[in-house]
Amino acid sequence: MDFTSLIPSASKEELVKEYVGKSLHDVPCPAVVLDISKLRKNCTDMLETVNSLKCGWRAHIKTHKTTELTRLQIGDGPGPANIVVSTVVEAENIVPLLLEYKSEGRAVNILYSFPLTSGVVDRLSKVSTALGPNGISLMIDHPSQLRSVAAIHEKTNIPPLVFIKIDMGGHRAGVIPGTETCSQLISSVITLTKRNVCILHGLYSHAGHSYSSNSQTAALDYLRQEFEALLITYEEVHSVAATKLPLVLSVGATPTSSAIRNLLLSSTSSEELNEISALKATMGAIHDVGCEIEIHAGVYPMLDMQQLATHALPEDLLSWSSVAITILAEIASLYPPRGTSDSPEALITAGSLALGREPCKAYPGWGILSPWNRTSFALPNTGPEGYSGWQISRISQEHGILTNPGKNDSELSIGQKVRIWPNHACIAGAGYGWYLIVDESRTGKEDEIIDVWARWRGW
């Protein structure tokens, strides 16, 4: 059965033939570049953290949409391969990898994390059939969506696992705990579970508003709020079920999922110690009622300016050197006295389609010029909020305007290649059909392309 998108990805073989062995200085712009040494480190750090804390792990693959990076997120070994997707095309394209893991004896599961609609029933039913029992999880936040859950069961004769999405303050999706709708939803799911139409597997939250964090303490507080919202909801589930019903309580956005690593670090801040103590107490209460804690996150392998601005970890663990994604562009023109107070400006070959039009709360621009291929410029220890060098201040469809408000950065030249740290990696990568892979740990060969990863396209 073919699960590939009707929008075909570029041929891996042709991409490798075209790019591998070339230097970043010799490829067309704009292009998106990933440093595999940073990807590996970020993925390893997350896996080691959740394993040390004895938490479950679910890797979100919506940011990159590739098989290669999914492998790094899941890791080796016999443990379960649980993933989250935001689109059906991600689920369809990752089925072969999960079947490979399944053949090795690993448990596999895909969580389709958008509240279920009737339009995806047929395609998700095929995914469920391919993976078999316990292979697919569905997200719901309204009782009416259970008709689609039942339709998938009818088509496959496999009861899908179900997560109830909880709105714990982000107001993007999810049912609000303690509301009548939440009570109706819990009761309806339990009824279908008793009829073996589905299996209530867990409660899920996404603290998207945790991107407003500006310290470890703030990110930890959002994480605690996630746990508390799910624990409160579980208490109602337990009451309605009238029996012990162990569930998976799945929390995370990259700021909160990163922040949980602070539990393994030494802290000198009394405020942070108090927050860690409160968080540990909440996690302990979850274990006491027999529930499993699961962590999920997506953009953490790449990171970006939005993530640096959260300061969810100490600076030695979350810094400029952690960011694995850059956008490769070329200087097209120079306008020396055009900026504010006669500051210089430059035109680059990357606009909103190449960078995304995503803001970062720490500074007013749309991307920051990395030090690559430039004379030395000292990056601040503070993150984007302290940066005063070349940055993308204005963008249109294909034009990006670099400004140097501090007039303290190196000069640029027409034809010079530059690499930009984007504000939001998920959006910046979406305009490209593939990633150029380099390994900056290869001394003397940092700019050599060693692989190309094709992205899945469409929905």
What is the meaning of each model-derived region?
Residues A259, S321-L328:
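Short coil-to-beta-strand transition motifs
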